[in-house]
């Protein structure tokens, strides 16, 4: 037993001095080492150490390709002057700000899939699809697979990538209609063992790029529940965007990076060099402006040096002067972001946050409510929707909006592969603002002294989950 404790101490010292990790997460792991001395180090080695991250980064060939193509696009594109609030982030993330885009806000699954199907039917060259959850055994999944198969038969190059962990029951055979039609289907970390080992590094992005000209991203996956068909979580509120313009090229580059990663994992099915050459031809800049909206595409995860989405949100929060509205299914962002929200509210900014009233994961919901308590005490207004909120949006001052795949939590900001679009446009921001205020009509505001009104055991439960929140 003494040997085990010495081993725990050595791991703890390494965690403290050599791992770039959130302080609260570090404290949680040290407590686990202390109270679970045998299994603690094993869990850490499997799920949180840099070893698995090192394995992923070594195999993630797409990162270097993404950097190269982004530099090429930056040189080709006559860069617009980015707003002062994000100039530092443009430089840090090395993804240029483009100002010739048209972005349409899609506020539910019905609208998103209706527009998506229309665009897919017009595809003539390529369709690239990436989802965390893609369930071809459900109605919307079957419809989409059938349409993709039809386009593949017409000679359109169709690539589909999904994450195994999103729907563990889904198998490759469920995509046979598309595969037999000539489409390519791949899985991110396909084996059950690899999915469990890499549970902390999930491909949480949602992205469709059509002919290199139109792109969709946001919170909506391909499953019936995203159309409000899950009676346990209805109504379902979600948000996606449809994009045309130069920003689509950067989204195409991101798909390319993720696709090349799975090609490296499945060399028996792919010639990676050929796949790269074909995908490079799909990275296109528009011949004419699609619109006048400014957009920056951000990605983060094990394949990026820094948490670019989190850092951008920090900057946007600090720049807000009048109002800041946030929608998120989970509110576990870490103390830095919580402090920034409190400071913004104390500075006179109208800070409001909309979270679900119906949880999908109860332990995460308890952590969300626990993080809400200190914000409520300091004046931040927080609402619970009568249904399930899966939208991941931020809007400030009728100037800037963000719509993406990243939840307002540590897992999205630091662990999973995520994607966000930051839109600088007054009309789009007003549309996001109005959508948020409309959602509040179906929501209940939490009281500032909410914590005093719940029972003793509920307070203990929420306190515990807030403590371990950085690990969720």
Show which residues each predicted segment covers.
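A short, conserved beta-strand element enriched in hydrophobic/aromatic residues
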Residues: 239, 327-328
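Short, solvent-exposed amphipathic alpha-helical segments in soluble enzyme
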Residues: 340-343, 370, 437
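C-terminal structural cap/anchor segments
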Residues: 349-409
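Helical hairpin unit composed of two closely spaced alpha helices linked by a short loop
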Residues: 330-351, 356, 361
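N-terminal localization/anchoring segments of enzymes in phospholipid and broader phosphate metabolism
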Residues: 1-311, 315, 319, 359, ...
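Glycine- and other small-residue-rich loops at beta-strand/loop junctions that grip anionic moieties
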Residues: 163, 329-330, 364
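Phosphate-/nucleic-acid-contacting segments
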Residues: 323
């Amino acid at each position: 037993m003494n040997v085990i404790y010495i081993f725990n101490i050595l791991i703890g010292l390494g965690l403290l001095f050599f791992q770039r990790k959130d302080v609260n997460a570090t404290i949680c792991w040290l407590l686990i080492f202390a109270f679970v001395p045998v299994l603690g180090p094993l869990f850490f080695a499997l799920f949180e150490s840099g070893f698995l991250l090192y394995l992923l980064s070594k195999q993630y060939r797409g990162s270097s390709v993404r950097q190269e193509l982004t530099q090429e696009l930056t040189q080709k594109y006559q860069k617009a002057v980015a707003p002062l609030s994000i100039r530092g982030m443009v430089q840090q993330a090395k993804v240029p700000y483009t100002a010739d885009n048209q972005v349409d806000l899609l506020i539910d699954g019905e609208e998103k899939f209706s527009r998506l199907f229309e665009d897919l039917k017009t595809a003539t060259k390529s369709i690239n699809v990436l989802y965390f959850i893609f369930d071809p055994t459900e109605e919307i999944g079957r419809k989409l697979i059938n349409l993709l198969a039809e386009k593949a038969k017409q000679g359109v190059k169709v690539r589909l990538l999904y994450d195994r962990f999103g729907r563990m029951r889904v198998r490759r055979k469920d995509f046979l209609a598309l595969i037999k039609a000539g489409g390519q289907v791949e899985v991110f970390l396909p084996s059950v063992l690899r999915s469990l080992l890499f549970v902390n590094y999930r491909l949480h992005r949602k992205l469709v790029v059509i002919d290199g000209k139109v792109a969709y991203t946001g919170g909506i996956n391909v499953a019936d529940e995203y159309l409000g068909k899950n009676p346990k979580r209805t109504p379902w509120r979600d948000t996606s965007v449809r994009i045309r313009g130069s920003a689509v090229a950067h989204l195409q580059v991101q798909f390319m990076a993720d696709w090349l990663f799975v090609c490296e994992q499945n060399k028996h099915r792919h010639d990676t060099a050929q796949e790269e050459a074909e995908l490079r031809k799909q990275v296109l800049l528009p011949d004419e402006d699609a619109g006048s909206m400014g957009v920056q595409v951000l990605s983060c995860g094990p394949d990026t040096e820094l948490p670019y989405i989190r850092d951008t949100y920090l900057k946007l929060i600090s720049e807000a002067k009048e109002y800041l509205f946030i929608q998120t299914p989970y509110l576990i962002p870490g103390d830095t972001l919580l402090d920034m929200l409190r400071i913004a509210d104390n500075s006179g900014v109208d800070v409001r946050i909309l979270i679900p009233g119906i949880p999908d994961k109860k332990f995460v919901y308890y952590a969300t409510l626990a993080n809400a308590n200190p914000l409520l005490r300091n004046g931040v207004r927080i609402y619970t929707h009568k249904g399930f909120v899966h939208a991941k949006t931020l809007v400030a001052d009728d100037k800037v909006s963000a719509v993406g795949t990243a939840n307002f939590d540590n897992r999205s900001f630091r662990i999973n592969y995520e994607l966000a679009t930051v839109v600088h446009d007054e009309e789009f921001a007003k549309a996001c603002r109005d959508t948020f205020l409309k959602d509040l009509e179906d929501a209940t505001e939490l009281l500032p002294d909410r914590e005093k009104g719940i029972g003793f055991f509920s307070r203990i439960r929420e306190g515990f989950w807030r403590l371990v929140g950085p690990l969720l």
